[in-house]
Amino acid sequence: TIDGEKEIETEALIIATGATAKYLGLEDEKKYAGMGVSACATCDGFFYRKKIVAVVGGGDTACEEAVYLAGLASKVYLIVRKPFLRASKIMQERVMNHEKIEVLFEHNAVGLYGDNGVEGVNLVKRWGEPDEERYSLPIDGFFLAIGHKPNSDIFKDYIDTDEVGYIITDGDSPRTKVPGVFAAGDVADPHYRQAITAAG
């Protein structure tokens, strides 16, 4: 650990700063962090065995998380902002045909509630429309699957990144266009974001 500024000379630099899950920006997400709010179904799903959970998102990741959680929970609500899923056709079919998953299209999560942890989510259906509807849905767990932000901001003036911020490497190699600089793990991996692939 370096306190303050220090210049270090090295023959190579490996950037492995990871990626951080995106949140909705609700104050309640911080309040219930570790008490019902999670951004990793494979990490925390087992806490919700035979319980009711909600997953926020409409892409492949959200659908995968919903299917995974459906193997543990008694009920999974998939909260989708749009009137359709953005996931691949096969993932859409898995979700829509799963008896434990209910998709709530055109819904926005606007808050969470509970005394000692998450006990429910406040929803708005068809936000801003004449038939807008607000209601509360009892749940035990709230999972976010709306993407990740790579922790690459401090390198953007020196290293090429894609439009999201993932560091661009040379194909399957960790090499960047800057000689001696490599990127490993989630900061350069927009697809898998798992410890096993980050370590590989």
Residue ranges of predicted features:
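An active-site-proximal "capping" alpha-helix that borders the catalytic cofactor pocket
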Residues: I196-G200
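Generic hydrophobic/aromatic pocket-lining and core-packing "Φ" positions
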Residues: A66-V67
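Glycine-rich Rossmann-fold phosphate-binding loop(s) that bind the pyrophosphate
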Residues: G57-G59
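N-terminal Rossmann-fold NAD(P) dinucleotide-binding loop
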Residues: A62-C63
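FAD-site-proximal beta/loop scaffold in flavoenzymes
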Residues: T20, G25, K30-F47, A145-R193
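Phosphate-coordination loops involved in phosphoryl transfer and adenosine-cofactor binding
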Residues: R49-K51, E106, V178
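A Rossmann-like FAD-binding core segment of flavoenzymes
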Residues: T1, E7-I8, I15, G71-G171
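Nucleotide donor/acceptor-binding cores
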Residues: A12, M35, K50-I52
